Amino acid sequence: MSRSQPNRAQDIPAVLFVTAMALFLLVTVNPVAGQAPAAARANSSSASAARTPTQAAAATAKFPTPGQFPPYKAPRTPDGKPDLNGIWQAFVTADIDVQDHDAQAGPHPDIMGAYGAWPGGQGIVEGGEIPYKPEALAKKKENAEKRMLVNITSDDHRHDTGDPELKCYTPGVPRANYMPFPFQIIQGPDRIMIAYEFARSLRTVYMNANDKTIPQEPPADTWMGWSSGHFEGDTLVVDSKGFLPYTWFDRAGDYHSDALHVVERYTQVSPYHIMYEATIEDPNVFTRPWKMSFPLYRRMEKGIQLVDFNCTEFVLDLLYGQYSKYPKK
């Protein structure tokens, strides 16, 4: 007996029924792409109506765009100038390298593990590259290779090798502003003091250009330079020169000569942020002026203050142990 063939005509109503149900569910659940069903929309509307004003504002608020701030007028000091008083800190990796940099292992990873390793990070140099002269770029590369060397044989050579930070030297400008330590701005009408936690560094910015008792030119080269300032609207402009040539911009060996000239701009753009810019000029090292920029953040911890950083005590044996009556072996 031959096997009976399936009656496909009988299957047609079932197929049509399944198709119709699928279309019904599709239209009911999602009548328009991106919209909830009517009942769900009604529930959502009820929930929206029940929101507090704060919740409603948060739901419609735009996320901030990095690098952009809404208009802001900083509070004023008694003499009408923008009030920059406070403790500030940068949160960038520029102290490692002011240009874009990859992560690197630290010295002796077999002993130190991850301690001393360099994290990767974005640079703060506008345009991405420092415009070195060819011979100066070769010196920068030599600095990078010798950044961990501290081979002191006499005071005549103590600046020749090693990152100055390694030896706890005063960091210089602008490096002091982006090291991983806070600093405090203490603002007065005729001068501004900036105290840095690292190496107990200090700067005085003279604000009264008409005061004839204050030299208009640096009386001597110093680690932090000679600084004069003025306000341009809400921006503090600080002009510094008269630097010793011994500081670096970072651990990567970026450096300058004693012809360094730095113009800094501090603009408070919110109660908690200062946008910092520095234009750097040194005709002995660079082919043209160049600029760096980054935000500074107000430290808001209760009772925040600078702490004593006895950096010198950490390196006395390293630098001068050979002169000790009982040198360590």
Residues covered by each model-derived region:
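PEST-like low-complexity, intrinsically disordered acidic/proline/serine-rich tracts
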Residues: 2-3, 13-329
